[in-house]
Amino acid sequence: LPFVTGSDGEFTVLGRGTPEIYINGRKVRDKTELDRLQANEILSAEIITTPGVQYGSSVGAVIRLHTIRKRGQGMSGSFYTDYSQGHEPIGNEGISLNYRTGGLDIFVKGDFAEINNHTTNISSQDIYASSDWNQSTENKSKQTYRTFNGELGFNYEIDEDQSFGMRYMPGTNIGNAHTTNEGTTLILQDGKEVDHLHALRQTDAHTGWWQAANGYYNGTFGKWNIDFNTDYLYGRDRIRQYAENNGIEDATSSNRVRNHLYAAKLLLTAPLWKGKLSFGTEETFTNRHDVFLQSGFSADADDRIKQTMLSGFIDYSLPLGKFNILAGLRYEFQQTDYYEKGIHQDDQSPTYRDWIPVVSIRYTSGNWFFALSHRTLKYSPSYDMLTSAVTYQNKYSYQSGDPFLVPQIHRATFFDAGWKWVNFSLSYDHCWNMYTSYTRPSR
């Protein structure tokens, strides 16, 4: 696909950021699902670099994958295995079984993966305060973990115009995910060495069973099409960290996290005049509880964040000869409730109401295309950015978030052009409330 780079479930669209990926109209919420999708199962792939308002305000690009619908009756199955060798080996094995009768398709899938990652990082950090500090670090990191992912569900075609289905997707780490970071750090103050550390940090993450469920319905009634999807996700993690410097214990911590997500989306489309009208609603409810305990290097934290996102959208696309015009508007209501140790924090619990417009025009002639678009993008801070927990990096560095962060707003204009396999993109982006990280002396 043009403009797409990346691998192993991590993809970027040049100039648009991380894409939202759909398989047969269903949003992919777990990137390991892409690892389990085999190339010979894909019927078609489409990239949308100017997503309409049916997609969230933070979506800069969309990749839509359609798989081959298996035909025939009775039982079928497949087995696959992948192996790759870098500094460490990575293996992946899976099995898939299908039973089809009439319009009913029942499927069971299982996937086992063994992952070994090895990285080397060399960094230098300068801090200018009452003294000038330099921190030079060479660090080697090794991560090992094993995972199991399963999938059980069915699809049912009532007739050629209607279908529905459900799937349940459990998964877990087999044992702990173990990460070892080991390296040296040289600390200079005003050009003079004040410390030389040999640091060792070990992290063990135990993931309980995560669970996901999805249901869908797609139907056509006359000129109207109805597409409905609903999702549920649950996951929990327990992370323990141990750090030492020059063979002496310096810090320990533990972190327990629970996540819930409920989401639903309804999309209706119908022809209108010479074009197509689309409108619908989208709702997302999340609940995250994060408990952080430490050995005295900072403060314990007990944060809970509940978020409600309600959206309504409408757009209209109109083909006019070699031109295609799209205009749409999305309304988003976002409410956040932030709790510290069970107490609601009013000043950290904002409510936002935003209008998200999208407009584009595209010209296509033979092997040429030209496109001009303008849209608003809104990026909400991640949970890690909002946390009040102070986590250990090394003897001299700690890291924390900011519960007072507000959404980052972009007004972006794009010009795209292409001829055969040659593509060109130019963009202008005006950003408000831009996120950044900074270093300051401890208080």
Which stretches of residues belong to each language-model region?
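Extracytoplasmic beta-strand/coil segments of soluble accessory domains associated
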Residues: 1-27
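N-terminal periplasmic accessory domains that precede
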Residues: 9, 32, 47, 58-80, ...
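Short acidic/polar hinge/loop motifs at secondary-structure boundaries
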Residues: 24-52
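Transmembrane beta-barrel wall of Gram-negative outer-membrane proteins
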Residues: 88-117, 132-179, 211, 219
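Residues that define the transmembrane beta-barrel architecture of outer-membrane proteins
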Residues: 89-93, 144-148, 207-211, 258-262, ...
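Outer-membrane beta-barrel translocator domains and adjoining extracellular loop/strand segments
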Residues: 119-131, 177-194, 238-247, 289-297, ...
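Face-selective signature of the C-terminal outer-membrane beta-barrel domain
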Residues: 149-175, 197-341, 364-369, 424
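Outer-membrane beta-barrel signature, preferentially recognizing the C-terminal barrel domain
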Residues: 202-204, 301-307, 347-350, 378-431, ...
